[in-house]
Amino acid sequence: MLTVEDILAILPHRPPFLLVDRILEIEDGLRAVGLKNVTMNEPFFVGHFPGRPVMPGVLIVEALAQVGAVIILRQPEYVGKIVMFAGIDDFRFKRPVTPGDTLKLEVSLDKMRRRIGKGQAKATVDGTVVAEGGLMFAIVD
């Protein structure tokens, strides 16, 4: 398990754009499961949407990408690098994520070639899939 302090030591992201609170499971270079506690205090709820707060889908994808970045950046050859989004494939959003939800963020890294990685990602709330699809990562200095 990785705490938020551990995550801050790995990722360059900082609040309010750090979207992972904890890593529950990790298999270095292969997969990880993260957690995001979604609270009413999230800055994006101010305008998305007044009176009916919904977490933007792109931020769910970003949270999943941050879990993927943790998988990559724990590998010795990539320590200190930055992982950027290179693409998303066939992403689907199944239901809204609202304040009080706990997002479980599951990412598997299927392929890593040079500085490009591909993987699969799934976000769930209480065991129900809320979003899933493919992610592509690029590693930069």
UniProtKB/Swiss-Prot annotation:
One of its GO terms (biological process) is fatty acid biosynthetic process. It is found in: Cytoplasm. GO terms for molecular function: (3R)-hydroxyacyl-[acyl-carrier-protein] dehydratase activity. It is an enzyme of class 4 (lyase). Its main location: cytoplasm. Signal peptide: none annotated. It catalyses: a (3R)-hydroxyacyl-[ACP] = a (2E)-enoyl-[ACP] + H2O. The keyword Lipid biosynthesis applies. Its EC number is 4.2.1.59. CDD domains: FabZ. The active site is at H48. The keyword Transport does not apply. One of its GO terms (cellular component) is cytoplasm. Pfam families: FabA (PF07977). Keywords: Cytoplasm, Lipid A biosynthesis, Lipid biosynthesis, Lipid metabolism, Lyase. Belongs to the thioester dehydratase family. FabZ subfamily. Involved in unsaturated fatty acids biosynthesis. Catalyzes the dehydration of short chain beta-hydroxyacyl-ACPs and long chain saturated and unsaturated beta-hydroxyacyl-ACPs. This is 3-hydroxyacyl-[acyl-carrier-protein] dehydratase FabZ. The gene is fabZ.
